Amino acid sequence: MSSDELTSTSSLIVIPCLNEASHIEALIEKLRPSLTPLNARVVIADGGSTDGTREIARRLATEDPRVLFLDNPKRIQSAAVNRAVAELGAGSDYLIRIDAHGTYPDDYCERLVEDALATGADSVVVAMQTVGFSTFQKATAFAQNSKLGNGGSKHRTGAVGHWAEHGHHALMRIEAFKAVGGYDESFSHNEDAELDYRLGKAGYRIWMTDKTSMVYYPRAKLVPLFWQYFGYGRGRAKNFLKHRAMPGLRQMLPLAVAPIAFGALLAIVNWMAVVPVGVWAAACLGYGVWMALGQRNPYGPLAAVAAMVMHLAWSAGFWRELLDFRRRVA
């Protein structure tokens, strides 16, 4: 695709961030070469950082007029993107969403715009490659890259370019974003899937690109991983309650984990109550052993433990949201 075709469009790149002082400047330097070819501006939408991120962002904005600083008093990412589009999106064709803690290829933004123009898609989503550094983080990365951890999700594993219902948000036509009302700010998690549902219902098309992808770094410790997936589960339940959109099969199976785990407490009455959770645990650990032996992956057993944490947390979050909803209605 010619450079003239790229510069015939304009893009607003939005980076929601909170306490990213160690990453934000390097990320801006990574994106800076793409700004002129794409006729783009980049917005750092800060949710009240206390680690120096705000000062760095303001300095970067004074050094380059294409870099903009925006306060995000609501703190969550969905609110950051909504405010950036509302206040700064006029005149831009595309919204490109960047995660402050991710890693991107040098030509990431160019490939997104190229695929949007080539396919006519209203949204272009990408696959995520999960990478870790510490022992537990590496194990979590292997879990999230495996079917045990992602259920075969194509935006986790990557696939040939195709039309999709959902994926990791990367690019969206601002006209389409505004037409469906942007992100629902009541969602602290799963706001991307909820927006994709509304896009699909409104007739907009989502393209999963195979021209580029991003690298994501998972939680490095067990407790933060649990609460992250607990939030994901709550978000998926909120989506169900709002749209009556049933979870897919790959999500339905983990839904049973929290009930059978709590049901195991009944083993003091009848030992059979522990059988379901035992079968689940054995299946997960067996998969981990297969990873260790069949794939020669030394992190296999620990990856299985990480996946079990993800299953349990996601299921617990889903059911907690349903129970809270019933209490609110009552």
From Swiss-Prot:
Protein name, per record: Succinoglycan biosynthesis protein ExoA
Gene Ontology cellular component annotations, sorted alphabetically: plasma membrane
Family statement drawn from the similarity comment of this UniProt entry: Belongs to the glycosyltransferase 2 family.
Any single GO BP term: polysaccharide biosynthetic process
Residues passing through the membrane, by range: 116-136, 260-280, 299-319
Bilayer topology: Multi-pass membrane protein
PANTHER family found in the cross-reference section: GLYCOSYLTRANSFERASE, GLYCOSYLTRANSFERASE 2-LIKE DOMAIN-CONTAINING PROTEIN
Gene Ontology molecular function, alphabetical: glycosyltransferase activity
Location(s), subcellular: Cell membrane
InterPro entries (UniProt xref): Glyco_trans_2-like, Nucleotide-diphossugar_trans
One Pfam match: Glycos_transf_2
Enzyme Commission number(s) of this protein: 2.4.-.-
Keywords attached to this entry: Cell membrane, Exopolysaccharide synthesis, Glycosyltransferase, Membrane, Plasmid, Transferase, Transmembrane, Transmembrane helix
Lineage: Bacteria, Pseudomonadati, Pseudomonadota, Alphaproteobacteria, Hyphomicrobiales
Keyword match Glycosyltransferase: yes
Purpose of the protein: Glycosyltransferase required for the synthesis of succinoglycan (EPS I). Needed for the addition of the second sugar (glucose). Catalyzes the formation of a beta-1,3 linkage with the galactose lipid carrier.
Protein's pathway: Glycan metabolism; exopolysaccharide biosynthesis
